[in-house]
Amino acid sequence: MQLQRLGAPLLKRLVGGCIRQSTAPIMPCVVVSGSGGFLTPVRTYMPLPNDQSDFSPYIEIDLPSESRIQSLHKSGLAAQEWVACEKVHGTNFGIYLINQGDHEVVRFAKRSGIMDPNENFFGYHILIDEFTAQIRILNDLLKQKYGLSRVGRLVLNGELFGAKYKHPLVPKSEKWCTLPNGKKFPIAGVQIQREPFPQYSPELHFFAFDIKYSVSGAEEDFVLLGYDEFVEFSSKVPNLLYARALVRGTLDECLAFDVENFMTPLPALLGLGNYPLEGNLAEGVVIRHVRRGDPAVEKHNVSTIIKLRCSSFMELKHPGKQKELKETFIDTVRSGALRRVRGNVTVISDSMLPQVEAAANDLLLNNVSDGRLSNVLSKIGREPLLSGEVSQVDVALMLAKDALKDFLKEVDSLVLNTTLAFRKLLITNVYFESKRLVEQKWKELMQEEAAAQSEAIPPLSPAAPTKGE
């Protein structure tokens, strides 16, 4: 909202009105900021409804301290399957479907509780029709899958995000949010985040990351869907943006994800692929056990969900924390994970990429093959390999360049017109795929080359006898 110069009479009316109506649903309290009589609006949230019996809080996610990671290794859970998904920077938001006997009601919650329908919480009302349809479809899918006649409470947890994308060619949102009481607010005035990155879209969006339900409606009967079930259901709900795996593997493979250089792919998924923002790093990733919530997993009494934040974001959010993060995670937890996975930095999969880009990524990585590696080795020759003149790293780089060269010859022009950020991602992916293949084959290749060299050298002939022998 743009600052305005307000005269004393208007100031008196505004401040007085704000004091008199401090519990009104959407009255913003106006306070003096700076000099010269300029005012800026400050959001005042209305009280939560007294009855919070239907509210089911979402847990705070732990940071990956060394002791937590050690506990997971000792329990045996670290060696099982985990997924790392993007951590979206927004505000916690829950969509509820509550069975009240003769009918079902849809309610909405922030982290602290279910909201009054007239609370202006970051403009979410603009998405209510879509949310209502999605939670009802999800309810029907659950009942069909599990043969249920009713579901007492269903909760779709996620993140409300967006309403900010500062690119010169991308206009601000022109949409307005209308509350049940008729009050209207522009989406362009919503400010979920203050940090300069990550930015996602000028429009408001929702990113789902968990589904839980209770047949009876009681809190103790809630069932949290495992990751695979979550994806199965979410993928069938129209227009639902949900957490997809960037990495799937052991805990160490997820911890080895290069969170420090991870650019958020969400703008491209939301149609802004041609308008990238420089340095638009993701906040980080959330890593969770694929069967989180399963009693067999939770019986170990250790955290089965953790979050990683990139140090650049941490410095913005909590100034002075970058050094602490480096000492408590990057130099300890992550370096330990990298050692255990032999230095293989985990690269983003194509699961978060738009269709054309995902196809291009697959096509390029298919070019990294055993046959191409053999061709590269034949060009190098045996002697440089055995002498160490050409190293394992050199071979990986040559393989990546060769794969990229042929890929560019045959690729569709659509790919050449993708964003610079995606083209950089392609180069990174082909290098790490080449590095992985060379590391996997290196010992065997060197043994074969050494054996071939031995066969190629003729055995020494017995020396001719000298005179007198």
From Swiss-Prot:
Residues 1-44 form a transit peptide. Gene3D superfamilies: 3.30.1490.70, DNA ligase/mRNA capping enzyme (3.30.470.30), RNA ligase (1.10.10.1810). It is found in: Mitochondrion. Residues 450-469 are annotated as: Disordered. It catalyses: ATP + (ribonucleotide)n-3'-hydroxyl + 5'-phospho-(ribonucleotide)m = (ribonucleotide)n+m + AMP + diphosphate. ATP binds at residues 59-61, 86-92, 111, 159, 209, 307-309. One of its GO terms (cellular component) is cytoplasm. The active site is at K87 (n6-amp-lysine intermediate). It holds the Pfam family RNA_ligase. Component of the RNA editing complex (editosome), a 1600 kDa complex composed of at least 20 proteins. Interacts with terminal uridylyltransferase MEAT1. Belongs to the RNA ligase 2 family. This is RNA-editing ligase 1, mitochondrial. It comes from Trypanosoma brucei brucei (strain 927/4 GUTat10.1). The lineage of its organism: Eukaryota, Discoba, Euglenozoa, Kinetoplastea, Metakinetoplastina.
